[in-house]
């Protein structure tokens, strides 16, 4: 069997949810935290993660997903708790029927959604979250539009409860607080006087802004998986260890060949890297076909038998090469770790790629990389 796999520590995810919940409750004793499991739980397996959280956490307030397909996967997997569709619905009749049948909560962010929603003959009222665009300029109603649609929905029989929700564009940049503070001010002034729950922000708010921004519901996304939302270049960055979250994914594979090359020999496609000395190379069963980034630079570290070794040469579809010259006794079958340890995190790997992030790296792993769970 090919050695590439993603080892998922479910206990770490449960620990991280509990960290988020405790931080929330310290600021708001009646507060709630939505566990975000969109994009297959950021590549960690949505159904397995949701089931484990429900079994091993004392109180799970609900789950957030992107689409109706993701929500149905949870329901069909036996998850009967609150599920919020973070992008609302995309088509009218088909999705609204499923929302009704499966009792999903939805975000509403456009006039078209409002018009479709109020016309549909629901069998029971639906919990909705009306989204305010407080300055991200993505989804949501502007402050000048918001009250029109709030009033329209608050008097509609299809609505059981209206929450108010927004999202922040710069919350992961602690050295640049002005934009987040401005968005928070707009959100408060626009909706805080209205009845019903408020939700503002995700992992960056939970870990970095609760002294300023605290609402009734927060959304724990990337932090659930042990990854800090804060950009490593920030002077005030918070590492996973400093905020007491544990990495949940360890990406591993194996050495499939060990060979020697002479100084001056090109390595890999295009000969991007040329051996600077007589070298011992390891060929590893991991490539961009598995989701490992093709754009990774030479020198990006991996762990071979617990020792750091640099990637040299271009990443191929199925393989990559590492310099084993300083590591003795490496043989085919030996383990290679790409990320998921205190010594080597997914954020470390992102630094060696152009214009990517830990979010992208963990969600881009392909089905060629099976998930192996530790319970």
Swiss-Prot record:
Residues at the active site: 38 (proton acceptor), 269 (proton acceptor)
Catalyzed reactions per annotation: L-alanine = D-alanine
MF term (GO), any: serine racemase activity
EC number: 5.1.1.1
Positions bearing N6-(pyridoxal phosphate)lysine: 38
Cofactor entry: pyridoxal 5'-phosphate
UniProt keyword terms in alphabetical order: Isomerase, Pyridoxal phosphate
UniProt cross-references to SMART domains, sorted A to Z: Ala_racemase_C
Homology family: Belongs to the alanine racemase family.
UniProt-listed NCBIfam families: alr
The protein, known as: Alanine racemase, catabolic
Source species of the chain: Schizosaccharomyces pombe (strain 972 / ATCC 24843)
Gene that produces this protein: alr1
